[in-house]
Structures are given as structure tokens and as C-alpha cells.
Amino acid sequence: MPSILERDQIAAVLVSASRDKTPAGLRDHAILQLLATYGLRSGEIRNMRIEDIDWRTETIRVRHSKTQAYTLLPLTEPVGEAILVYLRSGRPATDARELFVRTRAPYRKLDKLYSMVRRRLRDAGVKPRGKRGPHIFRHARATELLRAAVPQKIIGELLGHRSIASTAPYLKLATEDLRAIALDLPGTEVSA
């Protein structure tokens, strides 16, 4: 079963990462903001380009790595601020158009995010069950949206899914979570 991060755990990871003012720390904080806010896939972040951020309209264009379709999302203030700080103070001077690059030469796009996410979870003292890679932020975002009664179709669109069936595995955990809460209510009985 995939891990689910709760809102307070996500906040702890973001606060912990924001304290690291090194170039890698500024980059990681911006990436974690994207993961936490939008539930993006690792590949969507790694392939994000500088021109995908439109500061004038305050939007971010996301190319979904599985479907190659684009989604235009509102650029939230925390995400925009983290990206801006990274661009001004953390990103090395390079001709690479990818937004997030390695902090050491050769400056090219990141290969993977898994080890960075694992390290940042550990640094924040967050110990989720099961896997600890970037995808747990995606599951957390989908679960949070379902708990907020956002329709499954909208959740799927935000996650870049072409079909509602693709969204179902993300929502199964939230449904089980809600069922567990219902079973704990006084006066409810479970029949075997």
C-alpha cells in the first residue's frame, strides 16, 4: 500500500527544506513546493522548462509525462516565491532550458528526484510507511482533494489523467481512510 503524507508532515518537510540556503537546498525546496501543491509526477518536474512559468499571468504550464498533454495551472504564491528564490540565488548560470538543473557541472537537468525526496523526508523527521519517493506527494494531494469533496473527474484532470480509471488507485486510499473513520463512530457495527 502506498504511503500517504498528512498535511502536517508535508508542512514539516517544506519548513525543513526551506532552512537549507545552499543552491541544492533552494532547488529542492522549490521542487518540494511543486510536489506538495500540485501532486506532479517526477518527470513533469524534471522536464519543466524556464519558459513554462508565466510570471505575468501567474500560471505554470505542465506537460504530463505519461500523456504528453499540457495543463495550465495557477502559480501559487508559495510555489512562485520558491522558484524565484531558486532562480535568483540557487540556479547555476547555464544555457540549459530545464528549470531544475544539477548544482555541479555539467549543469543539466536532474536525472531523478527519489533520493532527494527520501533525504528531505528524513531530515524533517517524517517516516511514512512504505515508499518514500516523490509519488507519495501525488497520493497525498489526490487524497486531500477527495477529502475536500472535489469531484473525481476534476481530481483526474488536475493530475493529468485522460481517464477516470487512472485516478481510481489514488482515491482508493482516501476511500479506505473515510471508511475507517466511519467504522470508528459510536453505534456503528461491522458485520462479518
UniProtKB/Swiss-Prot annotation:
Superkingdom: Bacteria
Signal peptide coordinates: none
Lineage: Bacteria, Pseudomonadati, Pseudomonadota, Alphaproteobacteria, Hyphomicrobiales
GO molecular function, one term: DNA binding
Tyr recombinase domain residues: 1-183
Gene Ontology biological-process entries: DNA integration; DNA recombination; establishment of integrated proviral latency; symbiont entry into host cell; viral genome integration into host DNA
Catalytic site: R41, K66, H135, R138, H161, Y170
Keyword DNA damage: no
Homology family: Belongs to the 'phage' integrase family.
Pfam families, per the entry: Phage_integrase
UniProt keyword terms in alphabetical order: DNA integration, DNA recombination, Plasmid, Transposable element, Viral genome integration, Virus entry into host cell
Protein name: Putative integrase/recombinase y4gC
Database matches in InterPro entries: DNA_brk_join_enz, Integrase-like_cat_sf, Integrase_catalytic, Tyrosine_recombinase_XerCD
CDD domains linked to this entry: INT_RitA_C_like
